[in-house]
């Protein structure tokens, strides 16, 4: 197996492209000029996020698209290097039109996390972990 990437359905490619750029995701230069899809590179290892119009995603998966207003199909986690990075992402998400469903806060005494929904309701979380405080 060479690599893994995440495909998500979106209702508006251009709006989603703008949202993910505004929150700091790096556009994948391989697909930067495409109008029928969008692609971003996330993190130090360039994890690939692919965004497809709902009709294309439905064709690929041969099933209905999840209604994100009624439930979550997945929670995508992003690893932060500092608490400040968590706070900054929450601010960027709000400014870009996303919904922060869990404000930045401490969790279990060793994590600092926030959660947000993108423009299509896909749920994401960012957390900073203080491993030296993690219960043994």
Can you say where each PLM-predicted feature lies in the sequence?
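Mid-chain, well-packed structural core segment of small domains
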Residues: 74-93, 97-98
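A short, acidic/glycine-rich surface segment
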Residues: 57-63, 134-136
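Residues that cap or flank secondary-structure elements
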Residues: 7-8, 81, 108-109
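Alpha-helical elements of the RecA-like P-loop NTPase motor core of helicases
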Residues: 17, 59, 87, 124
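Short, flexible turn/loop "capping" segments at secondary-structure junctions
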Residues: 66-70
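N-terminal beta-strand motif that seeds the catalytic metal site of vicinal oxygen chelate
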Residues: 1-18, 73-78, 129-136
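Core segments of cupin and vicinal oxygen chelate
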Residues: 7-58
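Vicinal oxygen chelate
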Residues: 39-40, 90-136
């Amino acid at each position: 197996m060479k690599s893994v990437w995440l495909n998500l359905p979106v209702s508006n490619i251009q709006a989603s492209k703008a949202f993910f750029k505004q929150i700091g995701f790096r556009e994948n230069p391989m697909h930067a000029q495409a109008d029928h899809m969008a692609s971003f590179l996330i993190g130090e290892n360039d994890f690939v996020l692919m965004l497809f119009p709902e009709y294309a995603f439905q064709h690929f998966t041969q099933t209905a698209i999840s209604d994100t207003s009624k439930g979550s199909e997945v929670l995508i986690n992003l690893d932060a290097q500092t608490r400040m990075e968590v706070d900054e992402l929450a601010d960027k998400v709000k400014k870009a039109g996303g919904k922060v469903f869990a404000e930045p806060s401490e969790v279990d005494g060793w994590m600092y996390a926030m959660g947000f929904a993108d423009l299509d309701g896909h749920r994401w979380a960012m957390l900073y972990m203080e491993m030296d405080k993690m219960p043994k």
